[in-house]
C-alpha cells in the first residue's frame, strides 16, 4: 500500500523504513532522531497478509493505543489493519462484511480497529529490542522513552520501503 499524506499531531510523525530497518521521528521539518529497529522475522518477504505470518505491515497508520504496562517496556499500538488491509481481506475472503465494516469505521473514527480478525493486529512500536518480532517494530528502551514523550494518540506512522 502506498503511503498517503497524513496530518500530524503537534507536528509529529514517524516513518519506518523496512529496507533500512530504521525508525525516523520528526517534528515539523526537524528530525528528532533516526534509530535502528527490529521488524517481523519474515518482513523481507513482502506485506502482512494475516495473523501469524510474522510480517510487519506496510502502509499508513496512526497511534491508537499507549500501553505503559507492556511486557515489552512501553508500547504504542498502531491502527493495523487499516481500510486498505480490510479491502484486501474482504476481497480475498479472509474477513467477512461485518469485520470489514468494523475495521473501516474504527479507522474513520481514529480509534483502535479490531485486532482479533484473521488479518491480525496488535502491531506495536515497543521497547526491549531483541531479535526479530512477530510483526511489531522493536526499538531499544531508551528510544522508546523518546517516542513515548513525543507520541500521543493519533500520531501518524508510515511504514514503507
Regions found by a protein language model. Give the residues of each.
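N-terminal post-signal-peptidase region of extra-cytosolic proteins
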Residues: 2-14, 18-19, 36-65, 141-142
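Soluble periplasmic/extracytoplasmic beta-strand elements of cell-envelope proteins
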Residues: 13-15, 22-24, 36, 62, ...
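Arginine residue identity/basic-tract feature
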Residues: 26, 38-42, 66, 88-91
